[in-house]
C-alpha cells in the first residue's frame, strides 16, 4: 500500500498503544480552554448571532472525517426535493487564501474552493460559500436567496446560532480512546454530543454488522447511515458504467480521505481486486502520484476526483458514493424544519 504524509496517531484508536507523555501533559490545557470557550457562549458572555432562516449544523466531536460530506450532500438533495433552497456554509479546509470568502461553483478550482465544498457544489448545484467566519457565510447565503443554511463541520463554531445540530460518528472507530486532543481524537468531551438533536452513525457499506449504541438520555435520536457504491464514472467524460463490470478484475484504488480503508473494503466487497494507495486527507494530487508501474484502471473517491480533473485520462474513474438513511430520519428532520419555518415566517 502506498502511504504518504501524516497519519492519525495510532494511540487515538488503540488502547494498547502508549500515549506519549507530551500529549498527556497538554490534555488539561486543551480541556480547560475548550471548557472556558463553551461556557462563555452558554452563559451569554459571548454572543451568538443568528440568521432569519433555519440553520442546520453538521459536525462531530472527534477530529478527522466521519462522513460529514456524504451526509451534507444527502441533506441538500432531500431539502431540494422537499421544496427548500438550501445553501452550504463551509470553511473550505486546505484552500489557498483561506482568509478570503468566496462563492464555490462546480468548476471552481479546488485550490480556491477546497475539495469538499467543490464536491458539494458539483453534486448538488446548491449555493456554497466558503468563509472562515461561518456567520458571515450564512448571512451571504441568505442574501443570495437561500431559505435554509447547512453549516458543514460547524459544531464548534458557537458564534453562529443554530436550530438543529447533527453529530456524525464513525460507526467503527466511534470515539476512539475517549481522550481529548492531543492524547485522543476528541475535540470536545463525549458529553457534548448529547446536546445535539440527532446522532448519525456512519456504518459504511450495507454489509457491516456494527450496531449503534443507544444514548442514555431519552428522546435523543441515533440513526444509522450506510454508504453504497454502484457505478463508476470515467473521468474523461464518457458515460457512467456499472461497478459490477470490474468484478473479478484488479484495479488501483486511490483514497485521500480520513479513513481510506473503508473505501478499499467497499470495493473488495463488490468482488474487485484492490491494489490500495492511501494518501493523506485533503492531499493535493499531481499526475506523478499515479505512476504506479502497472496499467490498471484507477478508481478513486469523488472527493479525490475533483482534484484530479486537470490531468484526468481514460484510466481514471471516480466512484460515486451515496448516503442512505432511514425514512423516519427524514420525516423527523423535515417535520422539525417545517415547524421552525412557520415560526420564523420563512
From Swiss-Prot:
Pathway: Glycolipid biosynthesis; lipid IV(A) biosynthesis; lipid IV(A) from (3R)-3-hydroxytetradecanoyl-[acyl-carrier-protein] and UDP-N-acetyl-alpha-D-glucosamine: step 6/6. GO terms for molecular function: ATP binding; tetraacyldisaccharide 4'-kinase activity. ATP binds at residues 62-69. It is an enzyme of class 2 (transferase). Keywords: ATP-binding, Kinase, Lipid A biosynthesis, Lipid biosynthesis, Lipid metabolism, Nucleotide-binding, Transferase. SUPFAM superfamilies: P-loop containing nucleoside triphosphate hydrolases (SSF52540). The keyword Lipid metabolism applies. InterPro entries: LpxK (IPR003758), P-loop_NTPase (IPR027417). One of its GO terms (biological process) is lipid A biosynthetic process. GO terms for cellular component: plasma membrane. Its EC number is 2.7.1.130. It catalyses: a lipid A disaccharide + ATP = a lipid IVA + ADP + H(+). HAMAP family: LpxK. Belongs to the LpxK family. Transfers the gamma-phosphate of ATP to the 4'-position of a tetraacyldisaccharide 1-phosphate intermediate (termed DS-1-P) to form tetraacyldisaccharide 1,4'-bis-phosphate (lipid IVA). This is Tetraacyldisaccharide 4'-kinase. The gene is lpxK.
